[in-house]
Amino acid sequence: MEVKKKNTIDMTHGTLWNKILIFALPLAASSILQQLFNSVDTAVVGRFASSQALAAVGSNSSLISLMINLFIGISLGSNVVISHYIGQNVKKNISAAIHTAVVVAFVSGIFVLVLGQFIAKPVLLLMGTPQDVIDLAVLYLRIYFIGMPFILLYDFCSSILRSTGDSRRPLYALIAAGIINTGLNLILVIIFHLGVSGVAIATVVSNIVSSGILLFILLHEEEPIRLIPSALGISLPELKKILQIGVPAGLQGMVFSLANVCIQSTINSFGSAAVAGSAAALNFEFFAYFIVNAFAQTAVTFTSQNYGAGEFLRCRKVFRLTMIFSLLFCGLLSAVFVLGRDFFLHLYTNDPDVLVFAVQRLLIATTLELLTSAYEISGGAMRGLGHSLLPALITVFGSCVLRLIWISTVCRRFHEFWVVMIIYPISWVITGTIMITAYLLLRHETF
């Protein structure tokens, strides 16, 4: 196919299992490295600042996810649309979709930047952030939001490259940015004693670097993937298609994060030790989840290209292989974290009060993280087929509504930290069962 270049993968021909791994593993590495660099923020403030600084950074994670997940979902929409056009080899539409996606990314980033400055303190107060960390949490969040245009540009540009089968160069950009982030963290916190503001500044600078690298790559690609500044603009037909896929996915992520914000509010009620412990353990949860998410994104891209090319049997194989790989790799990584919990958790804190809560979260949630494969892979396959609303609705019900009901009923009656944590595996089982059933029914009707 003419749009296939040396950095891309031909998803519509040849053996699938090796191409899925070649695509997914750099994608997983990108997400894990991104979280690792975020974990450096947490570890540096936890070890070289204070437990309050650690809690301030950790208390923002669910709120940050809430703000950006809508636009990450839209970037997924651009991935599906561009992948579909690549499968059909419609060059004009590929270019139009790429330029539309970049404009949407930058405009959305500016919007979130401005909005974030106004809502930071009111929302953190509404979440019940402990008084001993509220000022630090607000400071971190406001600085973090300055980098939103660059965060979204990286997400959209990497989505564009991944739609062509290129998951390696986004990884290289992330590695370069992460090295800068780590170095700045150590300098600004340890040497200049800037605390949470130091790690926030380091994050902003690293996001500028990663997005800048990917923009440079797109500016020097061959057509129709090349980004041409004079061609930047919004194509309404392509925007409509991107939003049809992206908005349901984004709203799902946003509502999902809203449920986590409510859970975070409940965690806050246990005090700063619980907030810090949960934040420390959550890092390992993210590592395991991003394995699943990488194979889910692989399912989206491979399914979309093969569906566009009319290769329906390969769509079935993509689902089967991504599910197997997701369960296997996530299960192995979770086992490493759980078995080595004493070593890993002490990287973040030596406070015994904090460790009590961290161990509880690790044993309950991280141990069973592989269960998320059921709904993530199935939902990804459905989006690859062009159906985004159904998996969004299922996820909102199974992983959001159920969690909110649990928090407002069971957790109020039994105010124990482990009671809050156990809703995660419960919701994963329910959501996964419904999602797999929906995918199989949809696939039967489609081909």
Model-inferred region functions:
Residues 75, 143-162, 170-181, 199-214, ...:
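Short runs within selected transmembrane alpha-helices of multi-pass transporters and secretion channels
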Residues 27-80, 144-151, 240-305, 326-333, ...:
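Transmembrane helix-bundle signature of multi-pass secondary active exporters and lipid flippases
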Residues 39-42, 114, 156-160, 182-187, ...:
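Alpha-helical transmembrane segments of multipass membrane proteins
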Residues 26, 62, 186, 341-342:
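Short, proline-centered helix/strand-breaking motifs
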Residues 39, 48-51, 85-88, 163-164, ...:
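Helix-loop interface residues and adjacent transmembrane-helix termini in multi-pass membrane transporters
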Residues 1-24, 82-147, 180, 191-247, ...:
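Short alpha-helical transmembrane segments in multi-pass integral membrane proteins
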Residues 54-114, 151-170, 277-341, 372-395:
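Small-residue-rich hydrophobic transmembrane alpha-helices
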